[in-house]
């Protein structure tokens, strides 16, 4: 569960991260046109985002890319154009390579408590700074995170995606690194 919390934190300013496959799906962006400014792997999904309730302006991760067993510091900012209330939800999917690890619909207001926010979220500027300890046991490989975030009335809050590659940590021994 700590692992999914880390991914939710990673995608926190967008209140997550991209799109769950399903109805009304918009293809994930394949180029940098939808990259969110800053030092992170976050991108907006393809499509029109002019009506999104959350306008993400910047996300920085340190370290980027994240490293298993280390603290991940997330600095994110954005603008909320409409109050976000209880009942908002996130469709979240996390894949490890081709294997789906998480495929769930979660209560947004419950999830954002992991990044020290709570509902309702009022209109205006939103800044988040959060440190998350990533478990050392994260297997090396490529993780793809998709999230689609909606209000209780099914209005789009945001649609984000991220691809994160965790590298194998080497172990120092007297005979060399393993």
Curated annotation (Swiss-Prot):
Pfam families assigned to the protein according to its UniProt record, in alphabetical order: E1_DerP2_DerF2
GO molecular function: phosphatidylcholine binding; phosphatidylinositol binding; phosphatidylserine binding; sterol binding
Signal sequence annotation: 1-18
Keyword Signal belongs to the record: yes
GO biological process: intracellular sterol transport
SUPFAM superfamilies: E set domains
Gene Ontology CC terms, in alphabetical order: fungal-type vacuole lumen
Residue ranges listed under propeptide: 19-32
Keywords for the protein's UniProt record, in alphabetical order: Lipid transport, Signal, Transport
The keyword Cell cycle is assigned to this record: no
UniProt function note: Catalyzes the intermembrane transfer of phosphatidylglycerol and phosphatidylinositol.
Quaternary context: Monomer.
Protein family according to the UniProt entry: Belongs to the NPC2 family.
Name of this chain's protein: Phosphatidylglycerol/phosphatidylinositol transfer protein
Gene name of the encoded protein: NPC2
